[in-house]
Amino acid sequence: MQALSQLSYSPTAGANYRTRRALLQTCARLAVCVDIVLGPTLRLHCVFSDIIASRLSLFTTPLPTSASQLRDFPKRLAGRVILITGASGGLGSVLAMGCAAQGATVVLHGRVVRKLEALYDRILAADHPEPTILPLDLAIAKAEDFANVASALQSQHGRVDAIVHTAVLLGSLGPIEHQSFDSWLATLRVDLLAPFGLTRALLPLLRAAPDASMTFTLDTRGQEPKAFWGAYAVAKAGLSALLAILANEWENIATLRVNGVVPGPMRSPLRAQTHPGDDIRRLPSPDVFLPLYLYLISGQPKRESGAVIDGERWLRDAQPMNPPP
């Protein structure tokens, strides 16, 4: 049992998507057998449920362990076109600057033009490739809006090499009976329907790239839903399912990869909203996750797809985070 738990997070275990899926199916069957034979009182199947809930991360190459490993990415992203949703947010802006520093042309998506322009200026001031600004309110976006995004990127860049989903809307927290339909609709639009809509619209551009990747930013509340989290937890659960579906559908497409990261608690406006009494200064900065996202974007994982990386565990195993030289 313990060995299986360790295997589920092993960064060096060799397994492709089919092997991972077979392992999950075996665990699911075994979980049912354990529950039937031993009864619900022991609840041993919870060990397997934890694996089934998209927490399996079996990479054939080691994950980066510190920001100093950014030296291993010298302009690795040069010439690539990378769309980052929610680019003006805490995590999104870190990823935008990091990708631009590695030579990528970053498409900065956000809702507030002023914030996107400020990030645009920072990227240019650092002498990185000129980014593209993409203002779009995902809470009201429709299918034709995503089609227009695809058309504009096709005209301007010809392809999209990577999409990193960080845009998020918390919505309202509280008992279901006190949550409005409109709040749920807006949250589901931003957190679930928009990733689906963008993926669907941009798939031809991803296929035009020689090595395309998609990275979802997930949340433990989607894997372990609890009271009062409402539409946010439902949307994040749906996003985990979308990731698994895409990985399965793209299994035989060598140039397409999709993976996810569950960062865990970090210093962000979202955390300040959900835990207003906490001192978020004591939490990890979004910067510490940059090497992990760059690794997934860069193509270094090759055919690795369908994995979800537990950011908290990765941080515990990582070396001290020192800024790159």
What does each model-identified segment do?
Residues 88-89:
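Conserved glycine-rich cofactor-binding loop
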